[in-house]
Every structure is written in structure tokens, then in C-alpha cells.
Amino acid sequence: MKALILASLLAASAAQADPVADVARTYAAFWNTGDPALAQQALSPDFIDRTLPAGREQGVNGPLQASKGFRAAVPDLKAEATHIVPNGDLVSVRLHFTGHFTGKFGEVQGKGQAIDFQAFDLYHVVNGRIAENWHLEDNLTLLQQMGIMPGPQSAASKTQ
């Protein structure tokens, strides 16, 4: 009887495995850890960033450089994939980033400010790897938390 239950559970978990969601989890683990091997495992060699920020290199090296640069500013960066929603060869991911701005971002030195912002990504998966990515980060919140842009409270106090 135990063997039958175990076999049923294993069959159910195998049926629920989704390679599109799995590659999204691997790429989220890259953002969580900064481990370049995870990005190289998740991204196609022909990876295209469809919402490429100014100054970022196209292809696999772009996210590697972005992670390295942002981790220099926020060394304790964590990224949790709070939602992964696969649909065919596409998968939507909501990432929740947290940490403390203790390093340097451009010319700005962090003072330990808490960082807490969201990002949303849409991946196109081909042959088990992310071939294309469209992403949107809440950069306004991030820059306000870093003290690079005034927040709502500081803007309100200037008008009073």
C-alpha cells in the first residue's frame, strides 16, 4: 500500500513538473544568489533582452553585468520569485528584491538604506532556455529608497 501511495505521489509531482517554470526558477535563483552559472544555465546563448536598459550589453553578458553591479551596491541582495505563471512557451515572473544599500551605485555611497522593490518579467522559453525577456522594475521606488531621487515625503516637505 505504501508503495502505491508513493508511486502515485511521484507520478503526480512528475505530471506537475513544467520545464518553462523550472527555467524561470533557475533564473530567479541567479538573481537571488548572483551565481553566473545559474544565468548561463537558464539563458539561451542567443538570449535577447527586449527591454534593454541604456548602457547594458545585449545578450547573456547584460544580466551578468547588471547583477554584479547591483550586488556591489546592495551586497546582501535577495530576490524571491513570489509568482511564476507559465503559459505555453511563455512564463510571467514577479520578483521581490530586498537588501541594504551599503555599497556604491554610480557616484552615490549607500548608508545602509533598506531596499524593497518589485520587478515583473515575461520570458519566452525555447528548448528549455530563456530566449527572450521583457522586464519592468520599480526603479522609482528603488531610486527613492537609495536616496538618489526624492521620495513622496521629501517632495511634500519642500512644498510646505
Regions of interest found by a model, annotated:
Residues 36-90:
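A solvent-exposed, acidic/Ser-Thr-rich amphipathic alpha-helical stretch
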